[in-house]
Protein backbone atom coordinates (compact mmCIF):
# COMPACT_ATOMS: atom_id res chain seq x y z
CA UNK A 1 0.00 0.00 0.00
CA UNK A 2 1.72 3.16 -1.21
CA UNK A 3 0.56 6.61 -0.25
CA UNK A 4 2.26 9.22 -2.43
CA UNK A 5 0.35 12.48 -2.30
CA UNK A 6 0.93 15.67 -4.17
CA UNK A 7 2.04 18.66 -2.14
CA UNK A 8 -0.88 20.04 -0.21
CA UNK A 9 -3.30 17.79 -2.07
CA UNK A 10 -5.39 17.03 1.01
CA UNK A 11 -5.24 20.46 2.59
CA UNK A 12 -8.07 22.96 2.57
CA UNK A 13 -7.40 26.63 1.84
CA UNK A 14 -7.37 27.57 5.54
CA UNK A 15 -5.03 24.72 6.38
CA UNK A 16 -2.79 25.65 3.44
CA UNK A 17 -2.35 29.13 4.88
CA UNK A 18 -1.58 27.69 8.31
CA UNK A 19 0.78 25.17 6.75
CA UNK A 20 2.56 27.88 4.74
CA UNK A 21 2.83 30.10 7.81
CA UNK A 22 4.27 27.26 9.85
CA UNK A 23 6.92 26.47 7.26
CA UNK A 24 7.79 30.14 7.09
CA UNK A 25 8.47 29.96 10.81
CA UNK A 26 10.44 26.74 10.51
CA UNK A 27 12.62 28.00 7.67
CA UNK A 28 14.38 30.34 10.08
CA UNK A 29 13.74 28.48 13.34
CA UNK A 30 17.17 26.95 13.62
CA UNK A 31 18.88 30.29 13.06
CA UNK A 32 16.64 32.29 15.40
CA UNK A 33 16.81 29.75 18.19
CA UNK A 34 20.55 29.30 17.91
CA UNK A 35 20.05 25.60 17.24
CA UNK A 36 23.05 23.56 16.22
CA UNK A 37 23.25 20.18 14.57
CA UNK A 38 23.83 17.77 17.48
CA UNK A 39 25.98 15.56 15.28
CA UNK A 40 28.49 18.38 15.01
CA UNK A 41 28.69 19.02 18.74
CA UNK A 42 30.35 17.38 21.64
CA UNK A 43 28.86 13.88 22.10
CA UNK A 44 28.98 14.37 25.84
CA UNK A 45 27.16 17.69 25.68
CA UNK A 46 24.36 17.85 28.23
CA UNK A 47 22.43 20.71 26.66
CA UNK A 48 18.68 20.35 26.48
CA UNK A 49 18.49 19.66 22.75
CA UNK A 50 21.09 16.91 23.09
CA UNK A 51 19.33 15.02 25.85
CA UNK A 52 15.87 15.40 24.37
CA UNK A 53 14.34 17.72 26.93
CA UNK A 54 13.42 21.31 26.30
CA UNK A 55 12.22 24.46 28.00
CA UNK A 56 15.34 24.80 30.11
CA UNK A 57 15.06 21.59 32.12
CA UNK A 58 18.08 19.35 31.78
CA UNK A 59 18.03 17.78 35.21
CA UNK A 60 21.42 19.15 36.17
CA UNK A 61 20.25 21.60 38.81
CA UNK A 62 17.44 19.83 40.60
CA UNK A 63 18.00 18.03 43.89
CA UNK A 64 15.68 15.45 45.39
CA UNK A 65 15.91 13.60 48.67
CA UNK A 66 19.49 14.72 49.21
CA UNK A 67 20.70 13.51 45.80
CA UNK A 68 21.50 15.74 42.86
CA UNK A 69 19.74 14.63 39.69
CA UNK A 70 21.98 13.76 36.76
CA UNK A 71 21.41 14.78 33.18
CA UNK A 72 19.56 12.24 31.10
CA UNK A 73 22.07 9.52 30.33
CA UNK A 74 21.73 5.76 30.42
CA UNK A 75 23.99 2.76 30.78
CA UNK A 76 24.31 0.19 28.06
CA UNK A 77 21.50 -2.25 27.51
CA UNK A 78 22.50 -5.52 29.20
CA UNK A 79 21.15 -7.52 26.27
CA UNK A 80 22.20 -5.61 23.16
CA UNK A 81 25.10 -3.64 24.58
CA UNK A 82 23.63 -0.46 23.16
CA UNK A 83 21.90 2.53 24.67
CA UNK A 84 18.44 1.34 25.67
CA UNK A 85 15.34 2.91 24.20
CA UNK A 86 13.08 1.82 27.03
CA UNK A 87 11.82 4.32 29.56
CA UNK A 88 11.95 2.21 32.72
CA UNK A 89 14.87 4.17 34.21
CA UNK A 90 14.67 7.58 32.56
CA UNK A 91 14.93 10.48 34.90
CA UNK A 92 15.62 13.59 32.79
CA UNK A 93 14.46 16.44 35.00
CA UNK A 94 12.64 14.22 37.46
CA UNK A 95 9.88 13.13 35.08
CA UNK A 96 9.65 9.68 36.64
CA UNK A 97 9.26 10.76 40.22
CA UNK A 98 6.45 11.95 42.39
CA UNK A 99 8.20 15.00 43.85
CA UNK A 100 9.81 14.33 47.22
CA UNK A 101 8.98 10.64 47.29
CA UNK A 102 11.08 8.57 44.94
CA UNK A 103 14.55 9.04 43.52
CA UNK A 104 16.33 7.43 40.62
CA UNK A 105 19.92 8.26 39.83
CA UNK A 106 21.31 7.18 36.50
CA UNK A 107 24.49 7.85 34.61
CA UNK A 108 26.50 6.11 31.92
CA UNK A 109 28.44 3.92 34.34
CA UNK A 110 25.75 2.65 36.66
CA UNK A 111 22.02 2.61 37.26
CA UNK A 112 20.87 3.11 40.85
CA UNK A 113 17.46 2.48 42.28
CA UNK A 114 16.71 4.40 45.47
CA UNK A 115 13.82 3.22 47.60
CA UNK A 116 11.29 5.73 48.90
CA UNK A 117 12.64 5.50 52.43
CA UNK A 118 16.14 6.37 51.26
CA UNK A 119 17.59 3.30 52.95
CA UNK A 120 18.29 0.71 50.26
CA UNK A 121 19.77 1.42 46.88
CA UNK A 122 20.19 -0.86 43.92
CA UNK A 123 22.24 -0.46 40.79
CA UNK A 124 23.90 -2.23 37.91
CA UNK A 125 27.55 -2.90 37.36
CA UNK A 126 29.28 -1.80 34.22
CA UNK A 127 28.14 -4.93 32.35
CA UNK A 128 24.48 -4.35 33.14
CA UNK A 129 24.19 -6.83 36.02
CA UNK A 130 22.10 -5.50 38.93
CA UNK A 131 23.88 -5.21 42.26
CA UNK A 132 22.70 -4.31 45.73
CA UNK A 133 24.19 -1.64 47.96
CA UNK A 134 22.94 -2.14 51.50
CA UNK A 135 22.63 0.95 53.64
CA UNK A 136 20.02 -0.40 56.01
CA UNK A 137 16.25 -0.48 55.72
CA UNK A 138 14.21 -2.65 53.38
CA UNK A 139 15.85 -5.42 51.37
CA UNK A 140 14.27 -7.01 48.33
CA UNK A 141 16.98 -9.61 47.86
CA UNK A 142 18.07 -12.41 50.17
CA UNK A 143 20.99 -14.80 49.96
CA UNK A 144 20.00 -17.71 47.82
CA UNK A 145 21.60 -21.15 47.95
CA UNK A 146 19.17 -23.04 45.73
CA UNK A 147 19.70 -24.65 42.36
CA UNK A 148 20.17 -21.37 40.49
CA UNK A 149 22.33 -18.47 41.59
CA UNK A 150 21.91 -14.79 40.87
CA UNK A 151 24.78 -15.02 38.41
CA UNK A 152 22.93 -17.73 36.52
CA UNK A 153 19.77 -15.61 36.45
CA UNK A 154 21.73 -12.63 35.12
CA UNK A 155 23.29 -14.82 32.45
CA UNK A 156 19.87 -16.12 31.42
CA UNK A 157 18.52 -12.57 31.20
CA UNK A 158 21.45 -11.45 29.07
CA UNK A 159 20.73 -14.34 26.72
CA UNK A 160 17.11 -13.19 26.49
CA UNK A 161 15.58 -16.41 27.84
CA UNK A 162 12.46 -14.79 29.24
CA UNK A 163 10.49 -17.91 30.10
CA UNK A 164 13.44 -19.50 31.87
CA UNK A 165 14.08 -16.33 33.89
CA UNK A 166 10.45 -16.16 35.01
CA UNK A 167 10.45 -19.85 35.93
CA UNK A 168 13.51 -19.30 38.13
CA UNK A 169 12.08 -16.36 40.07
CA UNK A 170 8.81 -18.29 40.53
CA UNK A 171 10.69 -21.26 41.96
CA UNK A 172 12.63 -18.95 44.25
CA UNK A 173 9.42 -17.44 45.56
CA UNK A 174 8.11 -20.93 46.36
CA UNK A 175 11.28 -21.45 48.41
CA UNK A 176 10.76 -18.16 50.26
CA UNK A 177 13.23 -15.97 48.38
CA UNK A 178 12.43 -12.65 46.72
CA UNK A 179 14.23 -11.14 43.73
CA UNK A 180 15.40 -7.53 43.97
CA UNK A 181 13.60 -4.80 42.04
CA UNK A 182 16.32 -3.99 39.48
CA UNK A 183 16.24 -7.56 38.23
CA UNK A 184 12.45 -7.50 38.12
CA UNK A 185 12.56 -4.30 36.05
CA UNK A 186 15.13 -5.92 33.79
CA UNK A 187 12.93 -8.98 33.26
CA UNK A 188 9.92 -6.69 32.71
CA UNK A 189 11.81 -5.00 29.90
CA UNK A 190 12.64 -8.38 28.38
CA UNK A 191 8.97 -9.42 28.58
CA UNK A 192 7.92 -6.29 26.72
CA UNK A 193 10.57 -6.72 24.04
CA UNK A 194 9.70 -10.40 23.58
CA UNK A 195 5.92 -9.71 23.65
CA UNK A 196 5.64 -12.44 26.29
CA UNK A 197 2.30 -11.54 27.86
CA UNK A 198 1.89 -14.51 30.20
CA UNK A 199 5.34 -13.98 31.67
CA UNK A 200 4.62 -10.23 31.90
CA UNK A 201 1.62 -10.93 34.14
CA UNK A 202 3.84 -12.93 36.49
CA UNK A 203 6.43 -10.14 36.64
CA UNK A 204 3.60 -7.64 37.25
CA UNK A 205 2.57 -9.62 40.32
CA UNK A 206 6.15 -9.78 41.58
CA UNK A 207 6.70 -6.03 41.21
CA UNK A 208 3.44 -5.02 42.88
CA UNK A 209 4.13 -7.34 45.80
CA UNK A 210 7.54 -5.70 46.27
CA UNK A 211 6.51 -2.03 46.16
CA UNK A 212 3.67 0.08 47.44
CA UNK A 213 0.89 1.54 45.31
CA UNK A 214 2.58 4.94 45.67
CA UNK A 215 5.68 3.81 43.78
CA UNK A 216 4.84 5.58 40.53
CA UNK A 217 8.06 4.62 38.75
CA UNK A 218 7.43 0.90 39.25
CA UNK A 219 3.92 1.13 37.84
CA UNK A 220 5.19 3.16 34.90
CA UNK A 221 7.49 0.26 34.05
CA UNK A 222 4.53 -2.14 34.17
CA UNK A 223 2.56 0.05 31.76
CA UNK A 224 5.54 0.10 29.39
CA UNK A 225 5.86 -3.69 29.66
CA UNK A 226 2.21 -4.28 28.75
CA UNK A 227 2.51 -1.76 25.93
CA UNK A 228 5.31 -3.84 24.41
CA UNK A 229 3.18 -6.97 24.78
CA UNK A 230 0.31 -5.33 22.90
CA UNK A 231 -2.06 -5.55 25.86
CA UNK A 232 -3.69 -2.12 25.98
CA UNK A 233 -6.36 -3.40 28.35
CA UNK A 234 -3.83 -4.49 30.98
CA UNK A 235 -1.85 -1.25 30.63
CA UNK A 236 -5.04 0.77 31.02
CA UNK A 237 -6.06 -1.23 34.11
CA UNK A 238 -2.74 -0.37 35.75
CA UNK A 239 -3.06 3.28 34.72
CA UNK A 240 -6.59 3.61 36.12
CA UNK A 241 -5.60 1.94 39.40
CA UNK A 242 -2.81 4.42 40.15
CA UNK A 243 -3.76 6.98 42.82
CA UNK A 244 -1.02 9.31 41.60
CA UNK A 245 0.47 9.81 38.15
CA UNK A 246 3.38 11.82 36.81
CA UNK A 247 4.41 12.97 33.35
CA UNK A 248 5.95 9.64 32.43
CA UNK A 249 2.75 7.82 33.44
CA UNK A 250 0.69 9.86 31.00
CA UNK A 251 3.42 9.62 28.39
CA UNK A 252 3.47 5.85 28.77
CA UNK A 253 -0.26 5.36 28.26
CA UNK A 254 -0.31 7.79 25.30
CA UNK A 255 2.58 5.85 23.79
CA UNK A 256 0.77 2.58 24.50
CA UNK A 257 -2.32 3.69 22.57
CA UNK A 258 -0.29 4.99 19.64
CA UNK A 259 2.01 1.97 19.53
CA UNK A 260 -1.02 -0.30 19.34
CA UNK A 261 -2.64 1.60 16.47
CA UNK A 262 -5.14 3.55 18.59
CA UNK A 263 -4.04 7.06 17.67
CA UNK A 264 -7.37 8.71 18.42
CA UNK A 265 -7.40 7.30 21.95
CA UNK A 266 -3.88 8.66 22.40
CA UNK A 267 -5.02 12.16 21.39
CA UNK A 268 -8.08 11.89 23.67
CA UNK A 269 -5.81 10.92 26.57
CA UNK A 270 -3.64 13.96 25.87
CA UNK A 271 -6.75 16.16 25.96
CA UNK A 272 -7.76 14.61 29.28
CA UNK A 273 -4.24 15.24 30.58
CA UNK A 274 -4.53 18.95 29.80
CA UNK A 275 -8.10 19.19 31.11
CA UNK A 276 -6.86 17.99 34.50
CA UNK A 277 -4.62 21.04 34.67
CA UNK A 278 -1.35 19.35 33.76
CA UNK A 279 1.33 20.90 31.59
CA UNK A 280 3.00 18.75 28.90
CA UNK A 281 6.73 18.68 28.29
CA UNK A 282 8.81 18.19 25.16
CA UNK A 283 8.90 14.41 25.54
CA UNK A 284 5.13 14.17 25.57
CA UNK A 285 4.82 16.16 22.37
CA UNK A 286 7.02 13.62 20.61
CA UNK A 287 4.51 10.95 21.58
CA UNK A 288 1.68 13.14 20.27
CA UNK A 289 3.43 13.56 16.91
CA UNK A 290 3.79 9.77 16.80
CA UNK A 291 0.07 9.35 17.54
CA UNK A 292 -0.85 11.83 14.79
CA UNK A 293 1.35 9.85 12.40
CA UNK A 294 -0.53 6.69 13.36
CA UNK A 295 -3.80 8.50 12.64
CA UNK A 296 -2.45 9.98 9.42
CA UNK A 297 -3.72 13.36 10.60
CA UNK A 298 -1.06 15.83 9.51
CA UNK A 299 -3.12 18.90 10.34
CA UNK A 300 -3.71 17.75 13.92
CA UNK A 301 0.00 17.20 14.38
CA UNK A 302 0.92 20.62 13.01
CA UNK A 303 -1.58 22.26 15.36
CA UNK A 304 0.04 20.51 18.32
CA UNK A 305 3.46 21.61 17.11
CA UNK A 306 2.22 25.19 16.97
CA UNK A 307 0.79 24.97 20.49
CA UNK A 308 4.03 23.49 21.80
CA UNK A 309 6.00 26.68 21.38
CA UNK A 310 3.16 29.23 21.42
CA UNK A 311 1.12 28.00 24.41
CA UNK A 312 3.73 26.16 26.45
CA UNK A 313 6.93 27.97 25.50
CA UNK A 314 8.73 24.73 24.65
CA UNK A 315 11.61 25.34 22.26
CA UNK A 316 11.72 22.59 19.60
CA UNK A 317 14.83 20.44 19.52
CA UNK A 318 16.10 18.19 16.74
CA UNK A 319 14.19 15.21 18.12
CA UNK A 320 10.95 17.15 17.63
CA UNK A 321 11.85 17.98 14.04
CA UNK A 322 12.69 14.32 13.34
CA UNK A 323 9.35 13.34 14.90
CA UNK A 324 7.57 15.77 12.58
CA UNK A 325 9.30 14.28 9.53
CA UNK A 326 8.14 10.83 10.64
CA UNK A 327 4.63 12.14 11.25
CA UNK A 328 4.47 13.49 7.69
CA UNK A 329 6.32 10.74 5.84
CA UNK A 330 4.99 7.59 7.52
CA UNK A 331 1.39 8.21 6.31
CA UNK A 332 2.75 8.97 2.83
CA UNK A 333 2.87 12.78 2.80
CA UNK A 334 6.29 12.60 1.19
CA UNK A 335 6.10 15.92 -0.67
CA UNK A 336 5.11 17.73 2.51
CA UNK A 337 7.90 15.99 4.42
CA UNK A 338 10.40 16.99 1.73
CA UNK A 339 9.27 20.60 1.89
CA UNK A 340 9.65 20.54 5.65
CA UNK A 341 13.19 19.14 5.49
CA UNK A 342 14.21 21.62 2.79
CA UNK A 343 12.98 24.51 4.94
CA UNK A 344 15.46 23.59 7.67
CA UNK A 345 19.21 23.96 7.86
CA UNK A 346 20.79 20.79 6.34
CA UNK A 347 20.78 18.09 8.99
CA UNK A 348 21.72 14.45 8.54
CA UNK A 349 19.06 13.19 10.98
CA UNK A 350 16.24 14.75 8.96
CA UNK A 351 17.52 13.59 5.58
CA UNK A 352 18.25 10.07 6.81
CA UNK A 353 14.75 9.75 8.27
CA UNK A 354 13.16 10.92 5.02
CA UNK A 355 15.44 8.62 3.01
CA UNK A 356 14.29 5.51 4.88
CA UNK A 357 10.59 6.40 4.88
CA UNK A 358 10.52 7.35 1.19
CA UNK A 359 11.96 3.92 0.38
CA UNK A 360 9.36 2.27 2.60
CA UNK A 361 6.68 3.92 0.44
CA UNK A 362 8.41 2.94 -2.79
CA UNK A 363 9.57 6.41 -3.85
CA UNK A 364 13.04 5.34 -4.93
CA UNK A 365 13.84 8.62 -6.69
CA UNK A 366 13.29 10.64 -3.52
CA UNK A 367 15.14 7.99 -1.55
CA UNK A 368 18.21 8.31 -3.78
CA UNK A 369 18.08 12.09 -3.55
CA UNK A 370 18.00 11.90 0.25
CA UNK A 371 20.86 9.40 0.15
CA UNK A 372 23.01 11.92 -1.73
CA UNK A 373 22.28 14.51 0.95
CA UNK A 374 23.11 12.07 3.75
CA UNK A 375 26.38 11.20 2.05
CA UNK A 376 27.32 14.87 1.83
CA UNK A 377 26.44 15.56 5.46
CA UNK A 378 27.77 12.39 7.12
CA UNK A 379 28.77 9.47 4.90
CA UNK A 380 29.25 7.23 7.95
CA UNK A 381 25.45 7.06 8.34
CA UNK A 382 25.17 4.97 5.16
CA UNK A 383 25.66 1.25 5.62
CA UNK A 384 25.61 -1.53 3.05
CA UNK A 385 21.80 -1.71 2.96
CA UNK A 386 21.37 2.06 2.60
CA UNK A 387 23.82 2.26 -0.29
CA UNK A 388 21.94 -0.55 -2.02
CA UNK A 389 18.68 1.40 -1.80
CA UNK A 390 17.26 -0.72 1.02
CA UNK A 391 15.86 0.24 4.42
CA UNK A 392 18.51 -0.70 7.00
CA UNK A 393 17.54 -3.07 9.78
CA UNK A 394 18.07 -1.63 13.25
CA UNK A 395 20.18 -3.71 15.60
CA UNK A 396 17.52 -3.15 18.28
CA UNK A 397 14.94 -4.81 16.00
CA UNK A 398 17.21 -7.84 15.60
CA UNK A 399 17.57 -8.08 19.38
CA UNK A 400 13.79 -7.93 19.86
CA UNK A 401 13.22 -10.58 17.21
CA UNK A 402 15.76 -12.79 18.97
CA UNK A 403 13.97 -12.26 22.28
CA UNK A 404 10.63 -13.17 20.72
CA UNK A 405 12.08 -16.44 19.46
CA UNK A 406 13.64 -17.18 22.84
CA UNK A 407 10.36 -16.49 24.63
CA UNK A 408 8.97 -19.68 23.14
CA UNK A 409 9.52 -22.45 25.65
CA UNK A 410 8.56 -26.11 25.93
CA UNK A 411 4.82 -25.34 26.15
CA UNK A 412 4.89 -23.82 22.68
CA UNK A 413 4.36 -25.90 19.55
CA UNK A 414 5.94 -25.32 16.16
CA UNK A 415 4.18 -26.01 12.87
CA UNK A 416 6.20 -26.26 9.71
CA UNK A 417 4.27 -24.86 6.78
CA UNK A 418 4.92 -23.58 3.29
CA UNK A 419 2.42 -21.75 1.13
CA UNK A 420 0.02 -24.33 -0.30
CA UNK A 421 1.74 -27.26 1.41
CA UNK A 422 -0.85 -29.76 2.63
CA UNK A 423 1.39 -32.83 2.59
CA UNK A 424 1.30 -33.12 6.37
CA UNK A 425 -2.00 -34.36 7.87
CA UNK A 426 -2.17 -31.51 10.38
CA UNK A 427 -1.71 -28.95 7.61
CA UNK A 428 -4.42 -30.59 5.54
CA UNK A 429 -6.81 -30.26 8.48
CA UNK A 430 -6.04 -26.56 8.79
CA UNK A 431 -6.44 -26.07 5.05
CA UNK A 432 -9.91 -27.62 5.03
CA UNK A 433 -11.01 -25.58 8.07
CA UNK A 434 -9.74 -22.40 6.44
CA UNK A 435 -11.47 -23.25 3.18
CA UNK A 436 -14.74 -23.72 5.02
CA UNK A 437 -14.25 -20.38 6.76
CA UNK A 438 -13.56 -18.71 3.42
CA UNK A 439 -17.02 -19.69 2.17
CA UNK A 440 -18.59 -17.83 5.09
CA UNK A 441 -16.32 -14.86 4.38
CA UNK A 442 -17.51 -14.69 0.77
CA UNK A 443 -21.12 -14.74 1.96
CA UNK A 444 -20.59 -11.54 3.95
CA UNK A 445 -18.76 -9.73 1.17
CA UNK A 446 -15.13 -10.86 1.07
CA UNK A 447 -13.48 -10.27 -2.32
CA UNK A 448 -9.78 -11.22 -2.69
CA UNK A 449 -7.51 -8.35 -3.68
CA UNK A 450 -5.90 -10.31 -6.49
CA UNK A 451 -3.87 -7.30 -7.63
CA UNK A 452 -1.61 -7.95 -4.64
CA UNK A 453 -0.60 -11.34 -6.08
CA UNK A 454 2.37 -10.35 -8.23
CA UNK A 455 3.02 -13.67 -10.00
CA UNK A 456 2.03 -13.89 -13.66
CA UNK A 457 -0.64 -16.55 -13.25
CA UNK A 458 -4.37 -16.83 -13.88
CA UNK A 459 -6.99 -15.23 -11.62
CA UNK A 460 -7.83 -18.42 -9.75
CA UNK A 461 -4.17 -19.07 -8.95
CA UNK A 462 -3.75 -15.51 -7.68
CA UNK A 463 -6.70 -15.94 -5.32
CA UNK A 464 -5.27 -19.25 -4.13
CA UNK A 465 -1.86 -17.68 -3.47
CA UNK A 466 -3.47 -15.03 -1.28
CA UNK A 467 -5.52 -17.68 0.47
CA UNK A 468 -2.32 -19.52 1.44
CA UNK A 469 -0.70 -16.63 3.32
CA UNK A 470 0.70 -17.92 6.60
CA UNK A 471 -1.06 -15.59 9.04
CA UNK A 472 -4.42 -17.11 8.03
CA UNK A 473 -3.16 -20.56 8.92
CA UNK A 474 -1.77 -19.20 12.18
CA UNK A 475 -5.22 -17.78 12.96
CA UNK A 476 -7.14 -20.97 12.22
CA UNK A 477 -4.58 -23.09 14.08
CA UNK A 478 -4.90 -20.95 17.21
CA UNK A 479 -8.68 -20.89 16.85
CA UNK A 480 -8.85 -24.69 16.85
CA UNK A 481 -6.36 -25.17 19.70
CA UNK A 482 -7.64 -22.61 22.23
CA UNK A 483 -10.78 -22.30 24.39
CA UNK A 484 -13.92 -20.65 23.04
CA UNK A 485 -14.10 -16.84 23.22
CA UNK A 486 -10.43 -16.56 24.22
CA UNK A 487 -8.19 -13.94 22.66
CA UNK A 488 -6.22 -14.93 19.55
CA UNK A 489 -2.73 -13.50 19.01
CA UNK A 490 -0.81 -13.67 15.74
CA UNK A 491 2.70 -12.21 15.58
CA UNK A 492 4.47 -11.64 12.27
CA UNK A 493 7.81 -10.03 11.39
CA UNK A 494 6.57 -8.67 8.04
CA UNK A 495 3.96 -6.07 7.22
CA UNK A 496 0.52 -7.66 6.81
CA UNK A 497 -0.84 -7.37 3.27
CA UNK A 498 -4.15 -5.56 2.65
CA UNK A 499 -5.95 -8.76 1.64
CA UNK A 500 -4.89 -10.62 4.78
CA UNK A 501 -5.90 -7.59 6.83
CA UNK A 502 -9.41 -7.72 5.35
CA UNK A 503 -9.57 -11.49 5.71
CA UNK A 504 -8.47 -11.51 9.35
CA UNK A 505 -11.10 -8.92 10.28
CA UNK A 506 -13.85 -11.05 8.74
CA UNK A 507 -12.48 -14.28 10.19
CA UNK A 508 -12.39 -12.71 13.65
CA UNK A 509 -15.98 -11.54 13.25
CA UNK A 510 -17.29 -14.89 12.01
CA UNK A 511 -15.78 -16.97 14.82
CA UNK A 512 -16.60 -14.33 17.45
CA UNK A 513 -13.04 -14.06 18.74
CA UNK A 514 -11.01 -10.91 19.32
CA UNK A 515 -7.71 -10.93 17.42
CA UNK A 516 -4.49 -9.05 18.11
CA UNK A 517 -2.20 -9.21 15.10
CA UNK A 518 1.32 -7.79 15.29
CA UNK A 519 3.14 -7.05 12.05
CA UNK A 520 6.31 -5.10 11.31
CA UNK A 521 4.33 -1.86 11.42
CA UNK A 522 2.13 -1.99 14.53
CA UNK A 523 -0.42 -3.91 16.57
CA UNK A 524 -3.84 -4.48 14.98
CA UNK A 525 -6.69 -5.07 17.44
CA UNK A 526 -9.57 -6.67 15.52
CA UNK A 527 -13.06 -7.19 16.91
CA UNK A 528 -16.51 -7.45 15.29
CA UNK A 529 -15.01 -6.85 11.85
CA UNK A 530 -13.32 -3.58 12.85
CA UNK A 531 -9.58 -2.96 13.29
CA UNK A 532 -8.00 -0.43 15.62
CA UNK A 533 -5.84 0.88 12.75
CA UNK A 534 -9.02 2.03 10.95
CA UNK A 535 -7.73 0.76 7.61
CA UNK A 536 -4.56 2.76 7.91
CA UNK A 537 -1.17 1.28 8.66
UniProtKB/Swiss-Prot annotation:
Record-linked PROSITE patterns: PPR
Region entry Type DYW motif, spans: 443-537
Keywords linked to the UniProt accession: Mitochondrion, Repeat, Transit peptide
Any one Gene Ontology cellular component term annotated for this protein: mitochondrion
Ranges where the record places region Type E(+) motif: 412-442
Keyword presence, Transit peptide: yes
GO molecular function, one term: RNA binding
Subcellular location per the Swiss-Prot or TrEMBL entry: Mitochondrion
Transit peptide location on this chain: 1-110
Pfam families: DYW_deaminase, PPR
GO BP: RNA modification
Region (Disordered): 113-148
Highest taxon, organism lineage: Eukaryota
Bias-annotated ranges (Polar residues): 113-140
Chain positions of PPR repeats: 145-179, 180-210, 215-249, 250-280, 281-316, 317-347
Similarity section: Belongs to the PPR family. PCMP-H subfamily.
Protein's recorded name: Pentatricopeptide repeat-containing protein At4g32450, mitochondrial
Gene: PCMP-H63
